[in-house]
From Swiss-Prot:
This protein's name: Putative protein SPATA31F2P
InterPro entries (alphabetical): SPATA31
Source organism (scientific name): Homo sapiens (Human)
Family membership: Belongs to the SPATA31 family.
Signal sequence interval, chain numbering: none
Positions of the UniProt region annotated as Disordered: 133-154, 210-231
């Protein structure tokens, strides 16, 4: 087993941890033990070699000179006392173990004697804590009720968690919890470790682990290892890996928080773009990490909140509709109504009656419609608060009145048609078509009693009257057909009797098809099917001279 492996000692009962937290801690400890035994993956090691050409240093157990991890028998590298070292360096120095190479690929170069000596680990606590912290925990503490031995052993078990890969904030909370539960003074005024480098190994500075006890209360005890050399205070405060700067660490942390919130809550794309533009425009250096919960706009002062848990019940299509609605509203607030809509509104205003406009001119009001305005140079990017320019458009109630007037006109015309009243203008159009050359296009939806209407078409009073009509029964029409056909004086000059009969039959069938709701194709198919039967008797009459030739196709 690798000599730097840390053994996790958990007490039998942890009342302040839930089962879920315990499972997460177990998984984390397993990963940490695997890392301590097998090291980093080979690709990660290669990338670290590029970032760290000079690996971290160990201290020799016998002297006070720093040496490299990749220690050979003939070469040693001396650096200043202020060089930062990792947690594994402390663990090896406390246990008094020989030097071990840092890279996984160089573990095979270790001597058999060193490997045999590395397997003899004296105490797991010596790997996890330095000698001063170990003395402070193992020594007697001022307790009430004579619980010195029990509290000391309990603290030894609990403090073994602190350097097993727990997050730094969780380790700090454990420190405060353990010291408060055991009657030790809490750490309050101890300065926090500098955030210049990330906690890659999740370690704490050793002065935070030492309880605030007076030197007289804790009697001196001999160190566990006689070869251990106490490092300086500056080296104690910098037990970090020095290949990430503060800006890179904060940028990575902010990106990670953003991705986690995006995956958990599912922000709409519009909010993501607005927050991204606000971050770019308001914070040009981007040196400060913002809070992931709210992003404050620079001009309006309104905060754009992150979607909360109450919106998780939204289905996917509802989220898409909401995003589309937000995009439309943002475009409308920024650029105003489209140009075609504005032109149609102006045409509507100019096409209305002058009297209506004059009577309703007092009801018009100026409604502020935002127009495209150039952004200022200070980086304002709030798309929901543009500078508005006044444009004169009517209020919605005027459009409602126009719609109501048009609807009432359509309803009145439909009512007249259902009642059988034909306007006089329709009669005039029929008269003009019939009096000219033979109309080649039939009249759609004309009742079967049209021939009665045509008889009175020459009456000039019909131009100023409304002509009611009611369709006659089919049996009455069949009785009237064998008899004499009423002739119109104008129709006699242009139509023969057979043409009039054919026209009446076509109109009758079309009217019946219209009443029965048949499609338009039936209007064409039925007259074509009945055309030979209707015109069979008129073949002989075609030989005689007639003023107008009867067309072969029915009048459609």
């Amino acid at each position: 087993m690798h000599p730097m492996a840390l053994h996790m000692v958990l007490p039998a009962h942890l009342p302040f941890l839930s089962p879920e937290v315990l499972r997460l801690l177990e998984v984390h400890v397993k990963k940490w033990m695997h890392f301590q035994r097998w090291g980093l993956p080979r690709r990660v090691e290669e990338s670290l070699r590029q970032l760290m050409p000079n690996p971290p240093l160990y201290y020799q157990p016998g002297n006070d000179q720093p040496v490299s991890f990749n220690l050979n028998n003939t070469s040693q590298v001396s650096l200043h006392r202020s060089e930062t070292i990792s947690l594994q360096t402390w663990c090896s120095c406390v246990a008094g173990q020989p030097i071990q190479t840092f890279w996984v690929s160089e573990w095979s170069t270790m001597n058999p004697e060193q490997r045999h000596h590395c397997q003899q680990t004296p105490n797991p606590m010596a790997l996890a804590l330095p000698s001063p912290a170990l003395k402070a925990l193992s020594g007697p503490h001022p307790q009430s009720g004579g619980q010195d031995n029990d509290s000391g052993s309990d603290l030894q078990q609990k403090y073994s968690q602190l350097f097993c890969g727990l997050p730094s904030l969780h380790s700090e909370s454990l420190v405060a919890t353990f010291m408060g539960s055991q009657g030790l003074p809490k750490i309050e005024n101890v300065p926090k470790p500098p955030l210049k480098d990330p906690f890659l190994f999740n370690d704490l500075s050793f002065p935070q682990l030492l309880p605030k006890t007076s030197p007289q209360s804790a009697p001196p005890s001999s160190p566990l290892s006689p070869n251990w050399v106490s490092p300086s205070d500056h080296q104690r405060a910098q037990i970090n890996v020095p290949f990430l700067t503060l800006a890179e660490y904060e940028a990575l942390e902010w990106h990670l928080l953003q991705r986690q919130l995006q995956l958990q809550w599912g922000w709409p794309a519009a909010l993501q773009r607005s927050q991204h533009t606000q971050c770019l425009m308001q914070h040009e250096p981007c040196g400060k990490a913002q809070s992931p919960e709210t992003t404050t706009a620079s001009q309006t002062g309104k905060s754009i909140s992150v979607l909360t848990r109450e919106l998780l019940f939204f289905p996917e299509h509802a989220r898409k509709l909401l995003e589309f609605h937000i995009q439309k509203q943002s475009i409308r607030h920024r650029w105003g109504l489209p140009q075609k809509i504005q032109q149609s509104i102006q045409l509507l205003l100019t096409s209305t009656d002058q009297q209506t406009v004059s009577s309703s001119s007092t009801a018009l009001a100026n409604v502020s419609i935002p127009q495209p305005v150039a952004l200022e140079a200070n980086g304002a990017c709030d798309v929901l608060s543009p500078i508005a320019a006044p444009v004169s458009i009517p209020r919605p109630h005027l459009l409602t009145q126009v719609k109501a007037i048009l609807q009432s006109h359509i309803d009145s015309k439909c009512g007249q048609i259902h009642q059988g009243k034909i306007p006089a203008c329709v009669h005039r159009s029929w008269d003009c078509r019939i009096s000219g050359v033979l109309a080649v296009a039939p009249f759609p939806c004309i009742p079967e009693s049209q021939f009665l209407v045509l008889q009175t078409a020459s009456d000039p009073d019909l131009h100023h009257k409304v002509m009611p009509w009611m369709p006659t029964a089919l049996d009455q029409q069949q009785q009237a057909l064998p008899g004499t056909v009423t002739e119109h004086p104008k129709l006699l000059r242009v139509l023969s009797v057979e043409a009039i009969e054919k026209l009446e039959t076509t109109l009758r069938h079309k009217h019946l098809a219209f009443l029965s709701g048949l499609p338009a194709l039936y209007y064409v198919a039925l007259p074509r099917a009945l055309a030979p039967a209707v015109t069979s008797q008129s073949v002989i009459t075609e030989m005689e001279p007639s003023p107008v030739e009867i067309p072969a196709e029915p009048l459609i």
